[in-house]
Structure formats: structure tokens, C-alpha cells
Curated annotation (Swiss-Prot):
Hydrolase as UniProt keyword: yes
S-S bonds: none
Protein name, as recorded: Exodeoxyribonuclease 7 large subunit
BP terms from Gene Ontology: DNA catabolic process
Main location as per UniProt: cytoplasm
Organism per entry: Escherichia coli O6:H1 (strain CFT073 / ATCC 700928 / UPEC)
Top-tier EC class: hydrolase
GO (cellular component) term, any one: exodeoxyribonuclease VII complex
Amino acid sequence: MLPSQSPAIFTVSRLNQTVRLLLEHEMGQVWISGEISNFTQPASGHWYFTLKDDTAQVRCAMFRNSNRRVTFRPQHGQQVLVRANITLYEPRGDYQIIVESMQPAGEGLLQQKYEQLKAKLQAEGLFELQYKKSLPSPAHCVGVITSKTGAALHDILHVLKRRDPSLPVIIYSTAVQGDDAPGQIVRAIELANKRNECDVLIVGRGGGSLEDLWSFNDERVARAIFASRIPIVSAVGHETDVTIADFVADLRAPTPSAAAEVVSRNQQELLRQVQSTRQRLEMAMDYYLANRTRRFTQIHHRLQQQHPQLRLARQQTMLERLQKRMSFALENQLKRAGQQQQRLTRQLVQQNPQSRIHRAQTRIQQLEYRLAETLRAQLSATRERFGNAVTHLEAVSPLSTLARGYSVTSAADGAVLKQVKQVKVGETLTTRLGDGVVISEVSAVTKTRKSRKKTSNP
């Protein structure tokens, strides 16, 4: 045999590694049911046990971070359902499974299916409140979908008869347990909607195990309840039993009897309400009649009081009383008017204007004399002050100085000449005398030794 045709040779380590990879990649995660044996829990908190059936067994490990989510304590001999990964422990070549989750077998498997369907329908929105239909109030006809031989129907009919015997009830008999039950329940719901005889439906059964109630966890039943045009009250099992039908139904009743309570009226309570209403109406009528009678008596009395003869007599009496009051008032008014006239006459005499006018004229004459004297004195003093001022002005006036033989010479720009250096030859000068003005032209300028004002000859 050529070397190229020789079989592959594995080491033990490589063999175990290859087998482990094949198991993990090919098998992946699986569900396994079996009986627990050799269960141990060391200080690490991990679980080690064996799963077996009648002919085989396999070693299992469930690590602490996974087993703390298990809600029960595994027992020797207990049947369980586990979700696990298949692997191989390479150092010893031991084939084993690593458990991720564990639950009791039987009902545990059903519970798993229940949770999966619940999550699916919830994700689709079948449990949303916006899709819940209101129950009729009051209901005029009730449909019951349940077994005709079950205790649930007996309880429902008993409650309805006690509370509202006149309420019509239509029974849609169906199986509530077994493989055929979901299909029969769906057909009963569809039939009730097709006939449209009822305005509310009760769908339910009595209590039982999870397996007994499983028909109401069927997806077909849930979708039929959701699609029903007639409002549905679910009444499955006892108060602690919760099914998928309860989540989808428009209302969940804890028991069938409670469902009957919900959809019916309490006739005895209605009778009590009618009697109470009747009593209130009778009391209201009695009050109304008494009030009307009292009103009639008042009106009758008023009519008697307003008889024409009585009114005429009252008017006559009132007229006489008013006449007396008017006469007395006129006398008092005339008396007060006379007294007022006398008082005004006395005041007029006391306040005669002639004397007041005479006193005013005398006062005016006195004031005129005093005013004239004051004006004359002020005028004389003013004239004297004016004369003194004129005399003083004449004494200091430049014109008086000119009249005494002096003169004032100014240049062409009007500046008064005080020194010869202000004058230039050929310049025109103006000289003011006491009786006039002389205009001359400078032909020569001579400065004297003494600082005297130089005069120029024209």
C-alpha cells in the first residue's frame, strides 16, 4: 500500500476534540426527557446528575448560573424535560450534556407550549385592550358553549335561573376535552356568529389539570374567539386556572358561575329597585297633590279676598283716610308757608341795601382821596429825582466838555486819537467840536518831547 493511500491516524486528543466539535456543531441544542438519578450538588453550586430511561443513560451537568433559574428542587427518580447542548469531556473522553433549562416532564412540556403560544399571540396583538368588545347591558340572549353534560353548564343555568329567569339561553353543545374538542369549540363559535341569535357568549368548562384544560390553550380556539363578532366571556376552570382563551376573550370570569353573574341581571335586585322607584313615585305624587291642594286653597282664599264688594269697601276706607291726610297736609303746608313769609320779611328789613350802598359810597370817596394824595406825593418825588439826574448827566456829559473849548479827534476807523503814533500822513481825521465836526487830512506828524496829545492842522 502506498503512503498516500494509508488511513488517517488520529491522536487521542485530536480524536476527542474532533468528536466534541462534531457533537456540538451537528447536534446543537436539543430537548431531552428522562429520569433523574445520582443527583449531586458540590460546594461550587453546580448540579451533576444522570438522565436515564429504561435502556440507556447519559451524564449531565447544569452550572450554577443556569440552575438558579429552576423553580423546583430536582429529586431522584423525577421525570424532567431539559434543554441542553451535547458535548464531550476531552480529558476522559466522556460523552455528556450541558443542561441550560429544566422543567418537570408531562405538564412541564405543556407549560412550555403554553408559554410559546402566549408569547406568539401577544406579539400579534391579540391580547390588546383596543380589540376588547363591550358586553351588552342588559343582555337579551345568552349563548353558552360548553359540554351539555358538564358541571359548568349546570352552574351557569342555575345562576341564570336564580338571577334572571326570563333571560333566554341558547346552548351550543361541544366537547371540552380531548383531541376533537378544539375543532368543535371553533365550529360552535362560528355557528353562534352565523346564526346571530345571542348578544353575548360564555365559552368555558369546569376545573381540571393543565392537560384537561388544554383545549382552551389551542391556537385555533384563541383565533376563533378573537374573530368573533359577538362578545365572549371566558369561564375556564377555577380562579387559579388561566388559559390562552382568557387572554383573548373580551372578558375573563374566574368561574362559570361568575360568568353567569356577569352577563345576567339580578331580577330580585331589579324588583327591589322597581319597588323603591314605585315608593319614590308614590311619595312624589303625594307631595305633588298636597302641594296642589295647598295652592288651590291659597288661590281660593285670594279670590274671596278680592271680591268686588270687599275691594270697594277697602277702596272707600282708603279714600277717606287719604282725604284726611291731604287736608291735614294742606293745613300744615299753609301754616309753614305763612311762617316762612314772616321770617323772610324780617330778614329783608334787616338786610335793606340803601344803608349798605351809603356806607360803600363813603368808603369809595375816602379811598379816592387817599389815592390822589399818594399819587401827587409820588409824582413830586419822581420829578425831583429826575431833575437831579439831569443835572448830574449834564455835568459828566462829553458835550459839556466840548462846549468849554475842547475837541475829540478820531481816525477813519472811528478810534479816538490819544497819541501821534496813531496818525499817518495823508490820513483823514474827524474832529468833533462843541458846535460841529471838522474833517481834515494829515500833512505832517510831529512828536513833542512831552507826552502830550498832538493836534493836527488841516
